[in-house]
Amino acid sequence: MTTFDKGAKPDIGTFVAFDHVRFVVGNAKQAAYWYCANFGFEPFAYKGLETGSRITAQHAIRQDKIVFIFESALLPDNSELGNHLVQHGDGVKDVCFEVEDLDSIIAHAKAAGATIVHDITEESDADGSIRYATLRTYGETDHTLLERKNYRGAFLPGFKAHPMPATFFKTLPRVGLNFLDHCVGNQPDLQMDSAVQWYEKVLKFHRFWSVDDSMIHTEYSALRSIVVTNFEETIKMPINEPATSDKKAISQIQEYVDYYGGSGVQHIALNTSDIITAIEALRARGCEFLSIPSSYYDNLKERLAASSMVVKEDMDRLQKLHILVDFDENGYLLQIFSKPCQDRPTLFLEIIQRQNHEGFGAGNFKALFESIELEQTKRGNLFYDNVKDGNTK
């Protein structure tokens, strides 16, 4: 595991934080409801036929500082969203960052050769105005850069209060997720470095953390990962790629690439200050998470006993809930991973709690990979010999 110095502050505008994540899905209304019922969000903003939007419907849901938007086409001839859906299935299209001084950021991005999907645009309503531009990053994933200092509304121009009452969702156990911790992008083999260089060159992000396949591997598969972040280190974007296996096994990263149809967002990590309460609530709501064997916790207890680190959470409850623990001399983190959120084995969510620990669970990667490999085996996707032309032998 390697960490990096962030260097001098870039001479362009500021990347403030994650603003929201936009998904392209087959049915935005149903997807929004599913995430609300399962993961503790509540509907809060809407754009569709009733608000004057004739092309797409967008349902925005929120939990504390986390905002997801689900977008679907309204008309059958919408080839942009239609083609995206056929190629990738339900998935993340846009990871939006709030920024300050949009002009300088976009001027630099253009000079660096970035693909500009939408140049700087201003939109307004009775609550003020926003300015934004959209860049293409890896695959067909975009980053919208949003300047909202002159906007006083609840979300964005054109959105109205969501018509779906939150009464039912308020009867379910409260989850308590607080903010978006990091957003992970998977790349085909040997494309991680070019994706990382895009963030360094176009957005002036810096490398924060990395691991390679000598550290992260199982008997069957491995990965390499580099985390990039803005100068303030409020936006963290891990970039993964698979490592080749001599056992003809399919890495979980490669499985994602195969089923998503290329590079894309693999998972979104949501931060909580009380992961035990959060996971108990999520399981009560029906969320499914990866299972971790008891041997992992036996080994964890031995490693903790040989260290000076004290985990204040009850280990028996962590084990019962299948929550993973990683630690170093400074602190620890607790994390758990959902099963895929759609039929394709692509996007999933991570729930994470940090106690003075800024890593990404490198000590848990082996246990996580082995758990995912069990799921791949159930899907018939662990070995190339079992898969041919999309069909399981």
From Swiss-Prot:
Coiled coil: none annotated. Binds 1 Fe cation per subunit. Fe cation binds at H182, H267, E350. Pathway: Amino-acid degradation; L-phenylalanine degradation; acetoacetate and fumarate from L-phenylalanine: step 3/6. Residues 17-148, 179-339 form the VOC domain. One of its GO terms (molecular function) is 4-hydroxyphenylpyruvate dioxygenase activity. InterPro entries: 4OHPhenylPyrv_dOase (IPR005956), 4OHPhenylPyrv_dOase_C (IPR041735), 4OHPhenylPyrv_dOase_N (IPR041736), Glyas_Bleomycin-R_OHBP_Dase (IPR029068), Glyas_Fos-R_dOase_dom (IPR004360), VOC (IPR037523). It is an enzyme of class 1 (oxidoreductase). It comes from the Eukaryota. Disruption phenotype: RNAi-mediated knockdown together with fah-1 RNAi rescues the impaired growth and fertility defects in the single fah-1 RNAi mutant. PROSITE patterns: VOC (PS51819). It catalyses: 3-(4-hydroxyphenyl)pyruvate + O2 = homogentisate + CO2. GO terms for cellular component: endoplasmic reticulum membrane; Golgi membrane. The keyword Iron applies. Belongs to the 4HPPD family. Key enzyme in the degradation of tyrosine. This is 4-hydroxyphenylpyruvate dioxygenase. It comes from Caenorhabditis elegans. The gene is hpd-1.
